[in-house]
Swiss-Prot record:
Disulfide bonds: none annotated. The EXKPK motif is conserved in inositol-pentakisphosphate 2-kinases of both family 1 and 2. Belongs to the IPK1 type 1 family. GO terms for molecular function: ATP binding; inositol-1,3,4,5,6-pentakisphosphate 2-kinase activity. This is Inositol-pentakisphosphate 2-kinase. It comes from the Eukaryota. It comes from Eremothecium gossypii (strain ATCC 10895 / CBS 109.51 / FGSC 9923 / NRRL Y-1056). Keywords: ATP-binding, Kinase, Nucleotide-binding, Nucleus, Transferase. A motif (EXKPK motif) lies at residues 123-127. It is found in: Nucleus.
Length: 278
């Protein structure tokens, strides 16, 4: 039996049978299975050869595997794949980062928490952590999109003294022990934390880029890497008697064809009012 664990615009994440340890990430961006298989291979090499030098040990362990096309795979993928022009489905096999039997809570558009008997996993998309002297890109975009219920951004967690209050507010009403909040606050402040490392990586890549409205950089490989780093997902696993462990996923190369969209959105944000500053 095949179960869909997660759906995105370009990928499905599947589980097979009673195997709770491994998940299989399949590209569904194109209508052709062969095309999607090639994209999966390309994304695998991109993650290891381009993104991993930026994020190091935080990059999730993964391997390429080919699964024979079967009826159950056809069933779960039929709404996305129209042309079955290959006999196997190429997948990224990855560890399941959510504890078996845990209770999952969607906190908001960017944050989930998974509470298990022995571990708590904080899942989040930090988005833009690199600096913008004019306004907060994350919070201003939330207002532009009408997401007014989200009163924080992950960039604020890196400001001294703000992580604790934000985390307490974020997980209020959920069954998380005070030690989880305390340990996460201390972890975020460490130079080796995933948020700190991701911010440094974003800043280093962005330092070589001009404004988004410059045609020579809007679709460059460096711009695509910058956008990949701003759309990753982080999983931070917490155990009571151990240091937090972080893993980063969603490392696909962003298509250069989106450069016009990136430029238009940036221009829209620059005109939008009110812009959020903090």
């Amino acid at each position: 039996m095949v179960k869909i664990i997660g759906k995105g615009g370009a990928n499905y994440v599947l589980a097979f049978g009673n195997d709770n340890d491994d998940l299989y990430r399949i590209c569904v961006r194109g209508r052709s299975l062969r095309e999607n298989n090639r994209s999966t291979v390309d994304n695998y090499h991109y993650a290891l050869e381009v993104v991993k030098p930026q994020l190091g040990e935080f990059v999730c362990r993964m391997e390429l595997v080919d699964l024979p096309v079967c009826d159950s795979l056809r069933q779960v993928l039929k709404s996305k794949i129209e042309v079955w022009d290959a006999t196997t489905v190429t997948c990224l096999k990855m560890p399941n980062l959510v504890p078996a039997g845990s209770l999952s809570h969607t906190v908001d558009h960017f944050t989930k928490i998974h509470i298990g008997e022995r571990a708590i996993v904080w899942e989040f998309k930090p988005k833009w952590l690199s600096g913008n002297d004019k306004y907060c890109r994350n919070c201003t975009l939330n207002l532009l999109r009408g997401q007014t219920s989200i009163s924080y951004c992950h960039a604020q967690l890196l400001n001294p003294g703000q992580a604790g209050p934000i985390l307490k507010s974020l997980f209020a009403g959920l069954n998380v022990p005070p030690a989880f909040i305390e340990d996460m606050e201390a972890y975020i402040a460490q130079p080796c934390s995933v948020l700190q490392r991701l911010r440094v990586a974003q800043e280093q890549v962005d330092a070589s880029l001009g404004p988004l409205d410059q045609p020579d950089t809007a679709a460059s490989p460096e711009r695509c890497l910058s956008m990949t780093l701003k759309d990753v997902s982080c999983f931070v696993s917490w155990h009571k008697d151990a240091s937090p462990v972080a893993v980063v996923v969603d490392l696909d190369m962003k298509p250069a064809a989106k450069s016009a969209h990136w430029t238009a959105l940036q221009e829209q944000l620059d005109r939008f009012q009110p812009q959020v500053r903090h």
